[in-house]
Each structure stands twice: as C-alpha cells, then as structure tokens.
Design a protein with these regions (language model features):
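Single conserved hydrophobic/aromatic residue that forms the stacking wall/gate
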Residues: 1-15
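Ferredoxin-reductase
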Residues: 29-107
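A generic structural signal for residues embedded in beta-strands
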Residues: 63, 111-112, 261
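Short, surface-exposed secondary-structure boundary micro-motifs
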Residues: 66, 114-115, 264
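Short, Lys/Arg- and Gly-enriched loop/turn segments at beta-strand edges
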Residues: 69-76, 116-126, 271
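FNR/FR-type flavoprotein reductase catalytic core
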Residues: 98-250
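Local cysteine-cluster metal-coordination motifs and their immediate loop/turn environment
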Residues: 146, 224, 246-276, 310-319
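Short Fe-S-cluster ligation motifs
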Residues: 269-273, 277-319
Length: 319
C-alpha cells in the first residue's frame, strides 16, 4: 500500500501510515480461557490464528499486555491450528506476571509475537527412527508446560516416550492428566514426598537405569540448576541430552544480546539459535551467574561495561 503511494502525494503516504497504525491498534489477542493451575501458576488460551498456524513444539512467543507493559517470553504449551489458539502457562515471578495473572476470559493482549525460536529438533527426525529410540523427558516445575507439546506430538506420531515430572510438592504438579494421556510412562516425584514419591527427577532417572532401562536420548526442561544436574548425571550415564534454555530475553530476535549463552566454544543466543541446545556443552554456571546479574542495577551496569551495546542494559525486570 505504502509503496504504491510513493508515486503519489505525501498526503497519501501519511494517510496509509495512519491506517496501518489504526489496524495494528484494533488487532488484539483475545483470551478465550484463563484458569489457575497451581499457586502462582496460570494457564491461558489465546486467540492468535497466525501463530497457531505456523508454530511447532519447542517454540515460544513474546507477549505484551499494553503499551506500558513488559515484553514477556513464554513457551508455547499447546496449540490448535483449526481453532487458531495458543495455550500459554504463566508463573508469577515479578510485577508484570503478577499483573498478567489477573487477566480473565474476554481480556486481550496488545502484542502476541511468534512463533519465535527453533522448533524441537526431534520433530525434524524420521518418524521410524524415533520409534526405534528410547527417549526420556525430564520436566522440572514449570518445565512441564514446554515438555507437554513435544510429548503430545510424539504420541500423535506413534512414538512412546517416558516422562519424569518433578516439583517441590503435590500442589505444584501441573498438567498431570494431560501428560498421562500422551506419555508412554509417566513418573512423578516431589521434593518433599507429598505426592507419589520423594526425590528429584535425577533420582527417578537413576532408579530407572538401575532397573535396566536404556535411553538413547534425554530431553530436560526446567530451572537452570535442575537442568545442570540432569546433564551432570546423563553425561555420567552416557545419555545424549537436549536442554531448553530460558535465560532473560527482550526482543526475541537476537538483537539485544540479553539471552547470550556459552555453548562449547561458541556464543549462542537462546532466542534465535535455541532455545534447545546440547546440554553437555552448555555452560550453566555462566548462564546462572549472568541471569543473577541482570536482577541488580550494579550487575546490569557491569554487563554493559563488559559487553557494550550487545546486550539490553535496561533489562532485568522482564518477568
């Protein structure tokens, strides 16, 4: 529209630009469903047909509630291409997500950008090859949300996988029934022993291997510290491991540099190169240190001094 107007008057260019801005303002992403899954954890179905049409398991979106809102990266928990909906799971960790938790059906997001990141590498593999593999997924806490669409995709393609879900206590176990419906075997563990068994996801994996289970691949998603210890164990057991990294993100396109990671001898950006990486190559200690630095003004100043304009110096409160 604007290119056609370039041969016309300046007034035409201006009017076309105003129309585009107006159209952007009226396109809102309506929340069709909002429910509380657990303490400080909420699920929402959002009307976003374009994202639903193109997304794949493993990808994420960046949402913004209004003009003054933060840009918040959220993993896609599920999608329905026919209905044109995306399911997201939100955990309250700061002011923006606390505000988001009060949204209800009928409300809308101003921005809902995606799909971002690379799809899970598993969905690009030959189905018959996947059927011959023994795969285990380990989800820690909110990591159950991004694990679910991958396991669901595998189930829909005739691939049975084992799933280990861990949480601090029974009340923080989410999507249990949904996961039961798609997992070959589901193992649940809680830190305090309030549900099924006591222990970490790594304890369950150790026991399964000790019982004679053999795994060709492990996919671990959850807090960085959890993924670190899963990778330490799987390296010892000789199990190749994929992790989904969730560092601080701002633009989701690799421009801000906030999500940089050291993977082997290379610097990667989780938003464009990931979020999945070889867990045995990720420098978790550096990633956790960097994430912690973003949470203080002094830390952000240090990162700006070290990295110049290759990171978002004003970040740190996105979640």
């Amino acid at each position: 529209e604007i290119l056609r107007c370039l041969v016309g008057s300046e007034m035409c260019i201006r009017d076309s630009f105003i129309i585009l801005l107006f159209e952007r303002r009226i396109v809102m992403y309506k929340i069709l469903k909002a429910e509380k899954l657990a303490e400080k954890i909420f699920l929402m179905d959002v009307e976003a047909p374009r994202v639903a049409k193109h997304c794949e398991p493993g990808q994420f979106v960046i949402v913004k509630m209004d003009d003054l809102g933060e840009r918040i990266p959220l993993t896609i928990c599920d999608y329905d291409r026919e209905a044109g909906t995306i399911t997201i799971v939100v955990q309250i960790v700061g002011a923006s997500t606390e505000k988001m938790s009060h949204l209800k059906a009928g409300d809308a997001f101003e921005d809902f950008v995606g799909p971002l990141g690379c799809p899970s590498e598993l969905i690009s593999k030959d189905i018959e090859q996947l059927k011959k593999m023994n795969i285990v997924f380990i989800a820690g806490g909110l990591g159950t949300a991004p694990v679910y669409p991958q396991v669901k995709w595998m189930h829909e393609h005739g691939v049975d996988v084992d799933v280990i879900v861990g949480a601090k206590n029974k009340e923080l176990i989410i999507l249990e029934e949904e996961m039961k419906a798609v997992a070959g075997n589901l193992y649940i563990t809680t830190d305090d022993g309030s549900y099924v068994r006591k222990g970490m996801g790594t304890d369950v994996l150790k026991d399964l291997v000790a019982e004679g289970k053999h795994y060709d691949l492990c996919v671990a998603i959850g807090p960085m510290i959890m993924m670190k210890f899963v990778c330490l164990l799987t390296k010892e057991l000789g199990i190749p491991t994929i992790v989904s990294m969730n560092p601080i993100m701002v633009d989701g396109t690799g421009m801000c540099g906030a999500c940089r990671l050291k993977v082997g001898d290379e610097i990667k950006f989780a938003c464009v190169d990931g979020p999945e990486f070889d867990g045995h190559l990720v420098d978790f200690d550096q990633a956790m240190k960097r994430s912690a630095m973003y949470r203080t003004e002094e830390g952000r100043a240090m990162l700006k001094l070290q990295e110049g304009d290759t990171h978002h110096g004003g970040c740190g409160q996105c979640n």
